[in-house]
């Protein structure tokens, strides 16, 4: 069950759900329910000791709890709520009903303890506290309540915000109780390292590389007399710092009044510092000319090395309100007073002009985009161009504003986007860049007219001139017979225009010149208009033939280059990509450019500790080799690994692409159903990426090799072998036994363990028993329908993880899923080691080889790849699994007719080994409208339920068993046709016409 509150735990965030059931009853004897969400900042105390007494706070938010229509029984549903990862939540229900009540919590297929009690108002209270929210604890929580009057169900849906990476939050200060010291706190995931940065100088001169800077990696600071004091928190995402706001009475006041912004509920800290030759002076704080109340300030003093007295007076408020806004003035009997303006806001803001801006620059002009803004809290920002993101730097200005500049445009015309956000606000500003260029002119002529074409920016204008055959000068302007077509403009590029001259007898036999001009200059072309024959002749035949010769030579060289490149085909790129959505539509996204990220050397593994074996796969760009890695998982232990590498003559772009893939994998994290990164070798030699080794190869060949060993149930196997396998299925100490459905949900794992399972065995015993069980199962060398379901479930679970990490796979197929011990399957991306030139599954389309039969329509026809296009590919993968490795669309070649079939909504027939329910899932994955396809969390839930049902049916005649499938599916909620109508709706089963 979810981790309950523990004594003494410090929680960064507490979210409380309350559902209050009042005594008023409708005509149908249904209770009136009000669901409430209450957010808590809980930094000083832990959640209550018992889940029966959760915290309650102010500022409730109505979740609009309503009776669910068309549901069996009385079901109330609260609005879906998203919480941060590692948040702590309490689900609470108050029942205003006479008599005793009984209750039951149900979460992901499992019943959880429920202990109601009564409060002072004689209301029944049911609560559950979950600490440090993880992905496995997100889902639907059902509370079944039975009173003397009626029965009803309350449904809470809790999900984790789908952020690209973890969080790093700006630290803040708190006074240590009974001591003159400050505590620095940062609520971040993963847990940050907190450090104090002390500097003897102020502002820009206080650089961290300066010898005057002192760093202290501790959370409590007693040395509070320094000139510049900052607290910084750092984790995998980087570093965030907060400066202790200081008024120094010995410094000359700033030209503009210093300003400090805070949000309601945040702590306020202002330090007033003064130095004098003796101790005969004091400091006071005033807010709007009124002395601060006692308890909102404290003073410290010390003597410096030159025997001068240093006094500091802190003004602080533990949780500010709107009435704390105003001018805070620090006064001294020996120094001029100084003030600061403190502004308290309800929520964060970003103030800047968001109107789009257009710029025109010359080809070699130095230019930077810039955005000037005022924001609180500090923003996170990116610059984006052509779906690529670039680092964003900020610089503070004296007037409280900040500025961000982007100069790395490389004079590429187009649309540039500045995006900024903080915890409460978002801001986007668009820029358009045009490059001014002199027009370039091309000319052609026929028997009746001459035409000239030009591109340039700004829009060029045209003139035609007639040249005398006795003089090279062309001075006589032609105005009759000239027709200028309407100009077109390339997207964020040059203007393309043309002008045509209709021939007349007056100009035949003469040279004419067409000229295009704009503010950058003029370009001209000369044409000879001949009267005999339909074709014009260029005046200089030598130049004409020389041009033809150069063109032919260019064509020959280009052909040779194309032939050379054809062998190598296209530049290497990882199919797995992390995306950043930029708009409300899934189609508005760009791939995260990991070239700008730093590689974390903690992943570096000594290449001398690798002993290479055989080649597992080889392709146009690289190969994957089996190897033995010594000490990569545990000192003194060797394991088998798969090493991904480029071929010897890889160019710099391919090495850069492989390094980008490495950086992405380090950010991705690990999952049981993903081929996980174990380490890398990047120093002093070729780049090696070290992955988990899967001993049984890819799922496609695994299924094909097991066709003769397939049985629908274990009962068939026992009958066929006269129950000779029965001793194999005697229960091991760690086996899952029928009828034992009690589970525990661990906050740091997807795994489920029985309450009476392996808790009395050592780790070595458990590892030995598990290995022994796996070897016995694999010796059977059989494949069952439950195995197929388990494969489908595990792949969906892996894709659910990738969806949570904002990743798209783009080549999901059975050939890209690997099988290892225990029939565990793992999604991989070893396209580098696949020879797509000779693989018939990859078909030439445009200038690329693509896995056409696995691709969604939007990917095939529009080049759009989203998690929904991966769902389509997953449907094809399901078809592969339940046909035991048959190639999709059997007997249908990939030609123009195939593309028409896809556009017309054609679907494959039900595969031989699939049930009707599985086939319906396939059809829903193949919805032409991507919005009607199910999500991977829905697919995981449904397949987990199917797997549980199949398990019950298959083993009903067996006293003891060991499941072939890892039991991770048991932590999924049951699939409900009422709860997931979108998954099996007729709209998802039948394509739009």
Curated annotation (Swiss-Prot):
Glycans are attached at residues 43, 100, 151, 306, 323, 351, 354, 473, 502, 541. The modification Phosphoserine is found at residues 574, 759, 993. Residues 1-26 form the signal peptide. Changing residue 599 to F: Abolishes interaction with PTPN11/SHP2 and phosphorylation of PTPN11/SHP2. The active site is at residue 811. Detected in bone marrow, in hematopoietic stem cells, in myeloid progenitor cells and in granulocyte/macrophage progenitor cells (at protein level). Detected in bone marrow, liver, thymus, spleen and lymph node, and at low levels in kidney and pancreas. Highly expressed in T-cell leukemia. Disulfide bonds join 35-65, 103-114, 199-206, 232-241, 272-330, 368-407, 381-392. The keyword Endoplasmic reticulum applies. Tyrosine-protein kinase that acts as a cell-surface receptor for the cytokine FLT3LG and regulates differentiation, proliferation and survival of hematopoietic progenitor cells and of dendritic cells. Promotes phosphorylation of SHC1 and AKT1, and activation of the downstream effector MTOR. Promotes activation of RAS signaling and phosphorylation of downstream kinases, including MAPK1/ERK2 and/or MAPK3/ERK1. Promotes phosphorylation of FES, FER, PTPN6/SHP, PTPN11/SHP-2, PLCG1, and STAT5A and/or STAT5B. Activation of wild-type FLT3 causes only marginal activation of STAT5A or STAT5B. Monomer in the absence of bound FLT3LG. Homodimer in the presence of bound FLT3LG. Interacts with FIZ1 following ligand activation. Interacts with FES, FER, LYN, FGR, HCK, SRC and GRB2. Interacts with PTPRJ/DEP-1 and PTPN11/SHP2. Interacts with RNF115 and RNF126. This is Receptor-type tyrosine-protein kinase FLT3. It comes from Homo sapiens. The gene is FLT3.
């Amino acid at each position: 069950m979810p981790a309950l509150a523990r004594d003494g735990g410090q929680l960064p965030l507490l979210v409380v759900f309350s559902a209050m059931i009042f005594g008023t009853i409708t005509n149908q004897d249904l209770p009136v329910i009000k669901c409430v969400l209450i957010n808590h900042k809980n930094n000083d105390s832990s959640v209550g000791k018992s889940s029966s007494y959760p915290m309650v706070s102010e500022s409730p938010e109505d979740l609009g709890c309503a009776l669910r229509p068309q549901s069996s029984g009385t079901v109330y549903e609260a609005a879906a709520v998203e919480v941060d990862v590692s948040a702590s939540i309490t689900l609470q229900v108050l029942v205003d009903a006479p008599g005793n009540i009984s209750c039951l919590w149900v979460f992901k297929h499992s019943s959880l303890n429920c202990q109601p009690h009564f409060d002072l108002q004689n209301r029944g209270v049911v609560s559950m506290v979950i600490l440090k929210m993880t992905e496995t604890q997100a889902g639907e929580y059902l509370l079944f309540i039975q009173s003397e009057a009626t029965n009803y169900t309350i449904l809470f849906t809790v999900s984790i915000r789908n952020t690209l990476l973890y969080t790093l939050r700006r630290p803040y200060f708190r006074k240590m109780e009974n001591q003159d010291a400050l505590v620095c706190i940062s609520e971040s995931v993963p847990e940050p390292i907190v450090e104090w940065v002390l500097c003897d100088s102020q502002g820009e001169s206080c650089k961290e590389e300066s010898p005057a800077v002192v760093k202290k990696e501790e959370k409590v600071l007693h040395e509070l007399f320094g000139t510049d004091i900052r607290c910084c928190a750092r984790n995998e995402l980087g570093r965030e710092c907060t400066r202790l706001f200081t008024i120094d009475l010995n410094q000359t006041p700033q030209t503009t009044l210093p300003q400090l912004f805070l949000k309601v509920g945040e702590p306020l800290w202002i330090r007033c510092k003064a130095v004098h030759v003796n101790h005969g002076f004091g400091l006071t704080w005033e807010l709007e000319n009124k002395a601060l109340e006692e308890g909102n300030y404290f003073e410290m003093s010390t003597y410096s090395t030159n025997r001068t007295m240093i006094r500091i007076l802190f003004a602080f408020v533990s949780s500010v309100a709107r009435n704390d806004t105003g001018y805070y003035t620090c006064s001294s009997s020996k120094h001029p007073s100084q003030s600061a303006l403190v502004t308290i806001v309800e929520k964060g803001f970003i103030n800047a002009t968001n109107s789009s801006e257009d710029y025109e620059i010359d080809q070699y002009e130095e230019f930077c985009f810039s955005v000037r803004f005022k924001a609180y809290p500090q923003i996170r920002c990116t610059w984006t161009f052509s779906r690529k993101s670039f680092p964003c730097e900020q610089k503070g200005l004296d007037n409280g504003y900040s500025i961000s500049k982007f100069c790395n445009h490389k004079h590429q015309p187009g649309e540039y986007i500045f995006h900024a956000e903080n915890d409460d606000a978002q801001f986007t500003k668009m820029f358009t860049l045009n490059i001014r260029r002199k027009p370039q002119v091309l000319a052609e002529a026929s028997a009746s007219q001459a035409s000239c074409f030009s591109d340039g920016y700004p829009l060029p204008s045209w003139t035609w001139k007639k040249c005398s055959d006795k003089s090279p000068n062309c001075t006589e302007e032609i105005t009759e017979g000239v027709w200028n077509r309407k100009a077109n403009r390339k997207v964020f590029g040059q203007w393309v225009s043309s002008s045509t001259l209709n021939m007349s007898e007056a100009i035949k036999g003469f040279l004419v010149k067409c000229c295009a001009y704009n503010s950058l200059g003029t370009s001209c072309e000369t044409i000879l208009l001949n009267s005999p024959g339909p074709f014009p002749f260029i005046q200089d035949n030598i130049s004409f033939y020389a041009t033809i010769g150069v063109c032919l030579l260019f064509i020959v060289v280009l052909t040779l280059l194309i032939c050379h490149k054809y062998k190598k085909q296209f530049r290497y790129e990882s199919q797995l990509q992390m995306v950043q959505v930029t708009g409300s539509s899934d189609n508005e996204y760009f791939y995260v450019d990991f070239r700008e990220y730093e590689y974390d050397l903690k992943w570096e593994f000594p290449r001398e500790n690798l002993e290479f074996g055989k080649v597992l796969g080889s392709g146009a760009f690289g190969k994957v080799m089996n190897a033995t890695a010594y000490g990569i998982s545990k000192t003194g232990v060797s394991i088998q690994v798969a090493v991904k590498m480029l071929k010897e003559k890889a160019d710099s772009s391919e090495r850069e692409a492989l390094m980008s893939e490495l950086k992405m994998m380090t950010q991705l994290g690990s999952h049981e159903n993903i081929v996980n990164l174990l380490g890398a070798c990047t120093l002093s030699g070729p780049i090696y990426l070290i992955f988990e080794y899967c001993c049984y190869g890819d799922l496609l060949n695994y299924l094909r090799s097991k066709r003769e060993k397939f049985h629908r149930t274990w009962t068939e196997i026992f009958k066929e072998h006269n129950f000779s396998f029965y001793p194999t299925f005697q229960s091991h100490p760690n086996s899952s036994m029928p009828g034992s459905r009690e589970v525990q949900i661990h906050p740091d794992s997807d795994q489920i363990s029985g309450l009476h399972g392996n808790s009395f065995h050592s780790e070595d015993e458990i590892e030995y028993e598990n290995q022994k069980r796996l070897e016995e199962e694999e010796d059977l060398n059989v494949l069952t329908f439950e195995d197929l379901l388990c494969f489908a479930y595990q792949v969906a679970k892996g894709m659910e993880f990738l969806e949570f990490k904002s990743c798209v796979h783009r080549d999901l197929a059975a050939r890209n899923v690997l099988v290892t011990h225990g029939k565990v399957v793992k999604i991989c991306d070893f396209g580098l080691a696949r020879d797509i030139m000779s693989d018939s599954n990859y078909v030439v389309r445009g200038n690329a080889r693509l896995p056409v039969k696995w691709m969604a329509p939007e990917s095939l026809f529009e080049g759009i790849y989203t998690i929904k296009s991966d769902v389509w590919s997953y449907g094809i993968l399901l078809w592969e699994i339940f046909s035991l490795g048959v190639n999709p669309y059997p007997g249908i070649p990939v030609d123009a007719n195939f593309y028409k079939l896809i556009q017309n909504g054609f679907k494959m027939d039900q595969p031989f080994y699939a049930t009707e329910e599985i086939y319906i899932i396939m059809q829903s994955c193949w919805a032409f409208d991507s919005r009607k396809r199910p999500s991977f969390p829905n697919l995981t839930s449904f397949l987990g339920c199917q797997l549980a049902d199949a398990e019950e049916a298959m083993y009903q005649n067996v006293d003891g068993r060991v499941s072939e499938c890892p039991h991770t599916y048991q932590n999924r909620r049951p699939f409900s046709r009422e709860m997931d109508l979108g998954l099996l709706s007729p709209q998802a089963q039948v394509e739009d016409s």
